[in-house]
Curated annotation (Swiss-Prot):
Keywords: Acetylation, Calcium, Chaperone, Disulfide bond, Endoplasmic reticulum, Membrane, Phosphoprotein, Repeat, Signal, Transmembrane, Transmembrane helix. GO terms for biological process: binding of sperm to zona pellucida; ERAD pathway; protein folding; protein-containing complex assembly; single fertilization. One of its GO terms (molecular function) is unfolded protein binding. Functions during spermatogenesis as a chaperone for a range of client proteins that are important for sperm adhesion onto the egg zona pellucida and for subsequent penetration of the zona pellucida. Required for normal sperm migration from the uterus into the oviduct. Required for normal male fertility. Binds calcium ions. Residues 493-610 are cytoplasmic. Residues 258-338, 521-610 are annotated as: Disordered. Residues 317-350 are annotated as: Interaction with PPIB. The lineage of its organism: Eukaryota, Metazoa, Chordata, Craniata, Vertebrata. InterPro entries: Calret/calnex (IPR001580), Calret/calnex_CS (IPR018124), Calreticulin/calnexin_P_dom_sf (IPR009033), ConA-like_dom_sf (IPR013320). This is Calmegin. One of its GO terms (cellular component) is endoplasmic reticulum. The modification Phosphoserine is found at residues 560, 576, 579, 581, 591, 594, 601. The gene is CLGN. Residues 20-471 are lumenal.
Length: 610
């Protein structure tokens, strides 16, 4: 039972440690199981990585790797935000094309947001507008928060295909169709998927937000690794959001967005008004209740405690604070600019017991009853809470295919961040999942390969986890101590002292009645044994000789004369004991043979040869 308890305790400790490195809320499979596994060892990394700029294997609407080192086709915004001061309304954030700070892939570059606390806006035109019809929409790109993230976003906007779209004027109010990507402020971690649906009757665009993912997104913002974000919208009005090729959110455009696509069939009548006689009071004062005659409303809630007396030595005329007599006016004090100098106030040393006007403390008034109010009773005229009547919604419509959104023709990043060095790379917009997967294998795969190879060992991971959770050190010590205790208990068990009795008593044999024939047979056997004493003596000597030979083999040293004398004395005493026991048996036989009663005998115990 003790060992079972040890193993149970050890298992619980390991589970506690693993909980720090696992996301309990994630119900989807890990990336290693869903995506193409990449095995990397140090010998492979020692050779030169042959990175090639990804090339799409199928039709794409947009593809950008930034490996050329130039922002060809990208337009920096020159617009200003509305309703803000001119100094902070301009989009003056800086963009650069750089390699990753850590785990660089030779030859691979990305777009990096370089400024803190500034507005950034940059955009590019698609090769051709994407029209929502019978093909899926797949949007994919990479993000790396190289310095973590305090407050800011890394989402993209797909800009509506309109005649007035000018990329130099791209700002926060530019019409977009889809907004997708990570965003964080404080401890609120988000992965946006927002699309703007056009009302078929009014023509007004309304934002529809997909339900939030059911997984913990924190690690994607804090681990400083490059993560792959993918959005898939299908013509059957379903969607999927993937991170590192693992599904983290999916659902229906008809059911899993807020507010829903279809408006309610009925709405409250805006012209309906509550009648003046409508009574919403569930309880009313009892009209039959009368105030008791002895109810005194003039008594205060608290009165002075008359049992308390002013302490002796209380100084009524002394102030609590006095000017510091040791304070001096500074030499650089200018009364024209600083005003009249006054010494700082300090506690009055004379007020050790108390100073100022003394007042007794206040206590609750036992006679206080307060203002009398009649008790409440059920309102017999209660009509319930009034609500306007329902009327048919004049703007109601049915849209069974919300996938058919307005087309878009440009991709833009309009961001504000308190953290710099946000890395973007490998944008692609297409309609085939195989094209996007191949694009990721040629680009993002290399970053993950190198990051996994450079990942710290288990010891460093444990130490890093303990930096944020100091209590883990206790678990580490206990976890390490339990196996040591088990090994110690197995290898060096505690010796239990055995208690030996000085003497052991033998049980006497039970007296069994025997016949005369049996007794005569036993007498013959005893006489035969007495007639051949030499045989027994020779057998005994032979046994003693064998024992002496064994002792000589185990103990090569010769025995001393004293030891030989002791051994011979023991042999003589054993022989005398044996002869004495034989005489006693004869006497017992003779005594049992006489008498008129039934013949009984005590079973005799023969002496063992050793």
């Amino acid at each position: 039972m003790h060992f079972q308890a040890f193993w149970l305790c050890l298992g619980l400790l390991f589970i506690s440690i693993n909980a720090e490195f696992m996301d309990d809320d994630v119900e989807t499979e890990d990336f290693e199981e869903n995506s193409e596994e990449i095995d990397v060892n140090e010998s492979e990394l020692s050779s030169e990585i042959k990175y090639k700029t990804p090339q799409p294997i199928g039709e794409v609407y947009f593809a950008e790797t930034f490996d050329s080192g130039r922002l060809a086709g990208w337009v920096l915004s020159k617009a200003k935000k509305d309703d803000m001061d001119e100094e902070i309304s301009i989009y003056d954030g800086r963009w650069e094309i750089e390699e990753l700070k850590e785990n660089q892939v030779p030859g691979d570059r990305g777009l990096v947001l370089k400024s803190r606390a500034k507005h950034h806006a940059i955009s590019a035109v698609l090769a051709k507008p994407f029209i929502f019809a019978d093909k899926p929409l797949i949007v994919q790109y990479e993000v790396n928060f190289q310095d973590g993230i305090d407050c800011g976003g890394a989402y993209i906007k797909l800009l509506a295909d309109t005649d007035d779209l000018i990329l130099e004027n791209f700002y926060d109010k530019t019409s977009y169709i889809i907004m997708f990507g990570p965003d964080k402020c404080g401890e609120d971690y988000k992965l946006h998927f927002i699309f703007r649906h056009k009302h078929p009757k009014t023509g007004v665009f309304e934002e529809k937000h997909a339900k939030p993912p059911d997984v913990d997104l924190k690690k994607f913002f804090t681990d400083r690794k490059t993560h792959l974000y993918t959005l898939v919208m299908n013509p059957d009005d379903t969607f999927e959001v993937l991170v590192d090729q693992t599904v983290v959110n999916k659902g229906s455009l008809l059911e899993d967005v807020v507010p829903p696509i279809k408006p309610p069939k009925e709405i409250e009548d805006p012209n309906d008004k509550k009648p003046e006689e409508w009574d919403e009071r569930a309880k009313i004062p009892d009209p039959s209740a009368v105030k008791p005659e002895d109810w005194d409303e003039s008594e205060p809630a608290q009165i002075e405690d008359s049992s308390v007396v002013k302490p002796a030595g209380w100084l009524d005329d002394e102030p609590k604070f006095i000017p510091d007599p040791n304070a001096e006016k500074p030499d650089d004090w200018n009364e024209d600019t600083d005003g009249e100098w006054e010494a700082p106030q300090i506690l009055n040393p004379a007020c050790r017991i108390g100073c100022g006007e003394w007042k007794p403390p206040m206590i609750d008034n036992p006679k206080y009853k307060g203002v009398w109010r009649p008790p409440l009773v059920d309102n017999p005229n209660y009509q319930g809470i009034w609500s306007p009547r329902k009327i048919p919604n004049p703007d109601y419509f049915e849209d069974d295919h919300p996938f058919l959104l307005t087309s878009f023709s440009a991709l833009g990043l309009e961001l504000w961040s308190m953290t710099s060095d946000i890395y973007f790379d490998n944008f692609i917009i297409c309609s085939e999942k195989e094209v996007a997967d191949h694009w990721a294998a040629d680009g993002w795969r290399w970053k993950i390969m190198i990051a996994n190879a450079n990942k710290p060992g288990v010891l460093k991971q444990l130490m890093a986890a303990a930096e944020g959770h100091p209590w883990l050190w206790l678990i580490y010590l206990v976890t390490a101590g339990v196996p040591i205790a088990l090994i110690t208990s197995f290898c060096w068990p505690r010796k239990v002292k055995k208690k030996h009795k000085d003497t052991e008593y033998k049980k006497t044999d039970i007296c069994i009645p025997q016949t005369k024939g049996v007794l005569e047979q036993e007498e013959k056997e005893e006489k035969a044994a007495l007639e051949k004493p030499m045989d027994l003596e020779e057998e005994k000597k032979q046994n003693d000789g064998e024992m002496l030979e064994k002792e000589e083999e185990s103990e090569p040293e010769e025995k001393s004369e004293e030891e030989i004398e002791i051994i011979e004395g023991q042999e003589e005493s054993n022989q005398s004991n044996k002869s004495g026991s034989e005489d006693e048996m004869k006497e017992a036989d003779e005594s049992t043979g006489s008498g008129d009663g039934p013949i009984k005998s005590v079973r005799k115990r023969r002496v063992r040869k050793d």
